[in-house]
Amino acid sequence: EKINAVNLEKMYEVLKFVEYGGYCRRSMDCVHGMLLIDRMKNEAVVDKAVLFGWFRKMAVCAEQYERCGEGQNYKYLNPYGIVLSDEGEVLFLDTESRENAEVMKQMQKRAVRSHFIRPVYEMDTCGSREPDLFGYGNTLRFMLAYMKVVPALTKREEIRLFRICGKCIGETRKKYSSFLQV
């Protein structure tokens, strides 16, 4: 078993999505990897191509989750709810698994909830997909603030990411209404 020097890698129960003939099905799996938050704390430097790949994969997972759940939100789109597998996959933590109870406790803390979950009074006025878009936008912002990207982002990339985050969070007049727009 491959063990990280600081022993952060372990087994997690995650959600996987299977695409078949235009349909999407959700399944559960157990993978070896680490939480995104642990990766960020342990190694704050990330390759630009890898980071952009993570951003894309998170958006794809969120879109697949919504299609499989008939528009249902994941609700835990934050660095604690994302697992990076040893194979390089970006996966959503299975929030209903007893094996992930310790991580779920971390996600229930006020500091995590207040940063990544849209306030209740705003939820009443937003569409069904906006809570996950809000979490996605704040997760991107958190990652960009916390991690050093190598090679550095160009000014154009910074502006583009700033706009994407703003549209996800709802800080601009033009908001995303679906992950297909991201």
Where are the language model's segments positioned?
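Short, structured interface segments
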Residues: 21, 91-93, 180-182
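Conserved structural core of kinase catalytic domains
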Residues: 4-52
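Short amphipathic C-terminal alpha-helix that caps PH/PH-like domains
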Residues: 55-58, 137-144, 182
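C-lobe/activation-segment region of protein kinase-like
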Residues: 85-167
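Extracytoplasmic/periplasmic ligand-binding sensor domains
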Residues: 3-8, 20, 35, 57-61, ...
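Short, solvent-exposed loop/helix junctions and linker helices
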Residues: 48, 52, 127-133, 176
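A conserved short helix/loop substructure at the end of the activation segment
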Residues: 169-181
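Catalytic-loop of the protein kinase fold
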Residues: 54-55, 59-99
